[in-house]
Amino acid sequence: MSESSVNADTPKNTNDVLNGAYQSATTEPEGQYRSATDNPSLYQVPTHGSLYRNLSNSASAYYPANGNMNSREPANELSDISSLAEKGELEPPMAKLLSDPDFQGKQFPTVEAPELFIFELAPDSPSIALNWTFWRKMKTTSIYAYASLTIAWGSSVLSPASATLAKKYHIGMTTSLLNVSLFMLGYCLGPICWAPMSEITGRKTPLYIGLFLFSVFQIAVATAQDIQTIMICRFFGGYGACVPLCVVAAAFADMYPNRYRGTAITIFAAVIFVGPLVAPIVGGFLTKSYLGWRWTEYITSFMGFLSIILIYLFCEETYLKTITENKVQEYREITGNQLVHARSEEESLSARDIIMNYLLIPLKMLATEPIVFLVSLYCSFVYAIIYLLLEAYPVIFQEGRHFPLGVSALPYIGILVGVFIGCGINCLFEPWYFRQVIKAGNKPAPEARLPPMMIGSFLFPAGIFWLAWSGYYTYVHWIVPTLSGLLTGAGILLIFLQCLNYLLDAYLFRAASVFAANVIMRSAVAGGFPLFAVQMFHNMGVGWAGSLLGFIATALIPMPFAFFFFGKKIRAKSKMTAQF
C-alpha cells in the first residue's frame, strides 16, 4: 500500500479510542482499509513517532506492543482498548497516556485542522491546582507554609546574638544589628528576580533555587571567622530566603478559589509572623547555652534543606501555564509528535520582553499603581514594627527589668498570642466575604476584604501606646507590657493579612508580581527599623519612643476606610488592573 493511501485513510482523531469505544475490526484486503470514522481499526506501523511525523496525526497509534512491526495488518480485535493496557499489551508510555484524563475524549490535530495543535486543559481537569482534592491541596499548603516559616525564622534567629557578636568582633551594637538589616535587604532585592521567574518557569523552580541559597549561606554564617563574612552571607541568605514570600502566596492563589483563598492566606500571614517571634526565643537560649550562637544558623540550615526535600518529594506544580506545558511535553515525548504545543509556547520572549514584562513589573506597580503603593506602605509599617520590637523588647525587659538573655525574649509570646487572635477574628469574617463574592457574580471582591483591617487599624496603635507607657515605668509588673502584645499582635495580623488579600484580589492575574512589589517595600522599611530602634528608645525614652510609633499608626487609621469607600473607583482608573 502506498504512503499516499495510508495518509488518506489514517484516523483523523482519537475521540473514540480515548473513550474506549473501538469495536471489533473486520479484516479487509490490503488497499481497501476504511478510515477510523467508518471502521474503527488500529494499525501497526514501525514506530508511532514516524506515523506522527509523517502524517501529522496525534495520539492515534494506540497499538498493541506485540506483532509484526514490518507489516500494516490490522491490530488484534479490540472490544475495549483499556483492557489492553490492563493486560500489558500496550506499550507502557502509551498506556499511561491513555489513562490520563487530560487526554481522554480530546480531539487531536490533523493537517486539515491545524488549530487543534494547540493543547489546553479542560476547566474541570484534575491536573489544574484549583480542581485538586482537599487533601492534595493541604499537602502542598502545609509544606509551603513550613518553608515560609523557615525563612521567617531565619530572619531573626541571630538577633539575640547581636551583643555577643559585637563583643566577639569588637564592633558597635549598631553594626552588629546589620545581621538583621542586611538579611532584610536581601529580602528587598530578591523579588525582582524570583517573582518573574515563577511566572515563567512555575512556582517550584525558584523555590528550589532560593531555599538552596538560603540554606547554604546559613552554613556559611555558622562557620564564618570574621564579621565581614557573616554580614555578606546574611545578605545572600536573605536574597534566597525571599522566594517563599513572593511565590507561596501566589501558589495559594493558584490552588484556592475566592471562597477559601482568604483562609489560605491567613495561614501564610500567620507563619510570616510566628517565625520572627519564636526564633529569638530559641536563639536567645541557644546563644546562652554551651552550643553558642553558631548553632542558631546550623539548625536554620537543616530546616531549609528539609524544606527542599519535602517540596521535591510531595509538592506538585500549581501554576496553570507550567502544568499545561509539562503535559504537552509529556505527550510529545510519548508520541513523537512535536507539533502539538501549549498556547504559552507560541510566545517568543526576548531579553527586552523579559525585562519589561516580568523583571520590572513589581517596580512599575509601585511607581504607577496608587493602590499597590499605599497598601504596601501601610503593610510595610506594621511589618517593620515586628523587627523594631525585636530590639525594643530587650531595652524594656532586659535593661529595664534585668531579664537574662533568653528569658527577655519570652514576652514575644504576648504578640504571638495576639497574632492567633487576629487569625480567629479574620476567620469570623470569611462567611461574610463569601456572600459578597456571590453578590459580585463569583468574582473577587477586594473591598470586602477591608473590614477586618479597619478593626486592626484601631487595635494596633492601642497596643503600641499600652506597651510604651506600661514599659516606661519599671515598677509596673512585667505581665502588663507583655499583655499589650495581644492588641499589637492582633492588629498587625489583621492589617498585614488584609493588605495581602486586597492586593491579591485586585491583581489576581499578576499575583507573584504584586506580592513581589509588596515584599520589596516592606523589606526595605523593615531592614531600616532595627538600626535606629535602640537609639530611639534610649534617647527618647520608652514612653515617648513608643508614643511616636503610636501616633504614626493612628494617622494611618483612615487608610482602610478610604479604600473601602473609594477603592473601586481607583481600580477602575488603573491601566494595570484592566490590562491583567
From Swiss-Prot:
Ranges of compositional bias, category Polar residues: 1-44
Its membrane topology: Multi-pass membrane protein
Keywords: Membrane, Phosphoprotein, Transmembrane, Transmembrane helix, Transport
GO molecular function, a single term: spermidine transmembrane transporter activity
Keyword Methyltransferase: no
Protein name: Uncharacterized transporter C36.01c
PROSITE patterns, per the entry: MFS
Family in the record: Belongs to the major facilitator superfamily. CAR1 family.
Major location (coarse): membrane
TM spans (from-to): 143-163, 177-197, 207-227, 235-255, 265-285, 295-315, 370-390, 405-425, 450-470, 476-496, 511-533, 546-566
GO biological process: spermidine transmembrane transport; spermine transmembrane transport; transmembrane transport
Localization, UniProt: Membrane
Gene3D superfamilies for this protein: MFS general substrate transporter like domains (1.20.1250.20)
Pfam families linked to this entry: MFS_1 (PF07690)
Gene Ontology cellular-component terms listed: plasma membrane
SUPFAM superfamilies (alphabetical): MFS general substrate transporter
